[in-house]
From Swiss-Prot:
Superkingdom: Eukaryota
EC code: 1.13.11.12
Assembly description: Monomer.
Known function: Plant lipoxygenase involved in a number of diverse aspects of plant physiology including growth and development, pest resistance, and senescence. May not be involved in the bulk production of jasmonate upon wounding. Catalyzes the hydroperoxidation of lipids containing a cis,cis-1,4-pentadiene structure. Linolenic acid is the preferred substrate, before linoleic and arachidonic acids. Also has some activity with phosphatidylglycerol, but not with galactolipids.
Class of enzymatic activity (EC top level): oxidoreductase
Cofactor(s) listed: Fe cation
Xref: PANTHER family: LIPOXYGENASE (PTHR11771)
Note: 99% depletion of LOX-H1 by co-suppression-mediated gene silencing has no effect on the basal or wound-induced levels of jasmonates but results in a marked reduction in the production of volatile aliphatic C6 aldehydes.
UniProt note on tissues of expression: Expressed in leaves and floral buds.
Region (Disordered): 252-287
Induction: Up-regulated by jasmonate and abscisic acid treatment. Up-regulated locally and systemically at the transcript levels 6 hours after wounding, but the protein levels remain constant. Not induced by pathogen infection.
Residues annotated for Fe cation binding in this entry: 557, 562, 749, 753, 899
Protein name per the record: Linoleate 13S-lipoxygenase 2-1, chloroplastic
Amino acid sequence: MLKPQLQQSSQSTKALIPSWNTNPLFLASFPINILNKNFRLKKKNNFRVHHNYNGASTTKAVLSSTEKATGVKAVVTVQKQVNLNLSRGLDDIGDLLGKSLLLWIVAAELDHKTGIEKPGIRAYAHRGRDVDGDTHYEADFVIPQDFGEVGAILIENEHHKEMYVKNIVIDGFVHGKVEITCNSWVHSKFDNPDKRIFFTNKSYLPSQTPSGVSRLREEELVTLRGDGIGERKVFERIYDYDVYNDLGEADSNNDDAKRPVLGGKELPYPRRCKTGRPRSKKDPLSETRSTFVYVPRDEAFSEVKSVAFSGNTVYSVLHAVVPALESVVTDPNLGFPHFPAIDSLFNVGVDLPGLGDKKSGLFNVVPRLIKAISDTRKDVLLFESPQLVQRDKFSWFRDVEFARQTLAGLNPYSIRLVTEWPLRSKLDPKVYGPPESEITKELIEKEIGNYMTVEQAVQQKKLFILDYHDLLLPYVNKVNELKGSMLYGSRTIFFLTPQGTLKPLAIELTRPPVDDKPQWKEVYSPNDWNATGAWLWKLAKAHVLSHDSGYHQLVSHWLRTHCCTEPYIIASNRQLSAMHPIYRLLHPHFRYTMEINALAREALINANGVIESSFFPGKYAIELSSIAYGAEWRFDQEALPQNLISRGLAVEDPNEPHGLKLAIEDYPFANDGLVLWDILKQWVTNYVNHYYPQTNLIESDKELQAWWSEIKNVGHGDKRDEPWWPELKTPNDLIGIITTIVWVTSGHHAAVNFGQYSYAGYFPNRPTVARSKMPTEDPTAEEWEWFMNKPEEALLRCFPSQIQATKVMAILDVLSNHSPDEEYIGEKIEPYWAEDPVINAAFEVFSGKLKELEGIIDARNNDSKLSNRNGAGVMPYELLKPYSEPGVTGKGVPYSISI
């Protein structure tokens, strides 16, 4: 039986004593540069690791013919860069002279005679040939016989420009090659004189760290934490925390550009990465904004990525397409005059005359959106027909589809079981009016044809609700003061039919007291057997759908995946060494999340950005997500099984698959999600149990305990005193915590992100804002007459304006897009995992189970008994299929939140 961490693969790259070549001619051909015994890492005033190397004290040794040693070759793979500048010429000269990349090999263990670190072996790497678009640098070393295993390599980049180092392979050891995976930007020594540290691919708990690199391990973490002083520079890798205080312009004379600070007692929020930008002059709690938003260097989108990389497409749409649209649609309140005008977005397009010199680049980056019409020489924004309307153009109009999408649409996280009757608000009635709902027992029983009583329906788990009443009601009067948005608190009741589908029964819209008017509320039902009632129902649905769209984007998507994950990333880099096995397990799940979040703060969720200008809360959008965080977010309930239980959609049952019995058997998101959850959990279980075979290793792991403490007390510090935080004392505790995190970054995010264009690209299906009040709310005689004469126009006026709709459609298109280099879960093994045969085998099982899930989902989508994912014109539910081709496909589960 393989013992944890001890058994080695026959192809392991573990660095052992090299094979010795004692030929004196061979030895004499290799100079050895050995660092002095005082080789140290000093903490400078910014706490960056500094490797004290004095060239004058370094000796160039030539071994005698009796002194055993061997020559090894290190090959450094560097990815070619674009956007090169004038310093390239100087760097080319340095490459020719062989003085551009300096390496040190560091021994894994201390000198057993002296008890101190062994001298490092130094050599310059010379530029070699280019291979598959990468550049190889080669260095020759002579390794003394008593050097032992390689523990790390230090790099000094003597170019004037940073370089992206992919890996280093050292060949010549008797037991095979040593591989060191880097995948990191190495700064120029002209920006920062400190050397970079890269550890070997073997993972170690802190207590098992080889003695020769234990100090490097600790000091590298000190470097990554920084000292919290000053504005961060583009080449730095410092991870620190700050509140969301950069969404508005605190120094602006326009109050409409200012936003409150999110994070703290009044508006609790997760923390973001600290940039160190100067504070506002008028509000010292706020940070000034700038065009450059710092993220640690390795978190940024790589400039060597494909132009089709999703980050580039988002940037292009935000900074070129959206401004061009705004210049064309001069009236921001102009709606669509008729439904054919909406259809024209997909077959005629919108002229974009203002692209100018950005045009050629946009054709390459967003070819789905920007089309050149050759016969007219016009550039147009031409949308592709979303999958929903390709299958059934009128599906958005039907109640059965409205209900189905609560289980198999963009936002499957909001539907809840009704457990009490009658419905009551928990808000203060002195402020918001009577708490009792107007949805009566009689109405419900009438809508279900007296099939059963309300009491029986509640007892038998037949009633479900979309409840945005108490969350939205405190913001109704604030939002209604804004131009172009009309808000209500809403409740929508559904009935679970014998066929396993949901049937909408009633919508209640509520306005709290305002000025001298009392609370207003009204209930609408789909079976008002007259034309007026039918149109009122469609208008009420438009309001509810705008609420669900806003909640989806602000809470289910932004808050619960992007925003809440950033503290996990910061804590992991500050507290877990790069050689820690848990860091290496989590790392693929964190790629590019901080950069996409920074881009969101710059132009999506900022004051007057795309979200505020196009979704119903307007300037209160992100503030509303703070309210939801304070009232609803719990780490323990981010785990899919616990989330389903908390919403009444499942109960624990050991006799059922996944240990849960679902309240709605045909619940596509839950059905597929639970299979994926179990696959992730088994992978995490195998991984954790391998590195923590004894329970006491969890509590004694100082890095792990510091990591979890920092997540709870700093990253999510506004929730630090909550009793629901899991303990971290056993391997099972760790398995639960890690599985929850990786589920959020993979399955949860995929479920709420990659179907956005398919479901919401045709905006009548998912309007982001309702711009007009209900015709029955305090109407004048003229208003009522207009509605009675032009109900279709009333619905169109309620929908988003032309600029709101097209901006959101363009953004949703790129957010739903998979880049050609997308990294899907279980597709490729990480080099660190492949290093260990036990983890390698566990990954093969993980990958195989994910391929099986593909087949399971296909079979379910072809099962005619599953009406929530199969039927005439029904979109199959594929959002949790693990793999996808590039483009807008409505499927595919990447490791990380990179879009």
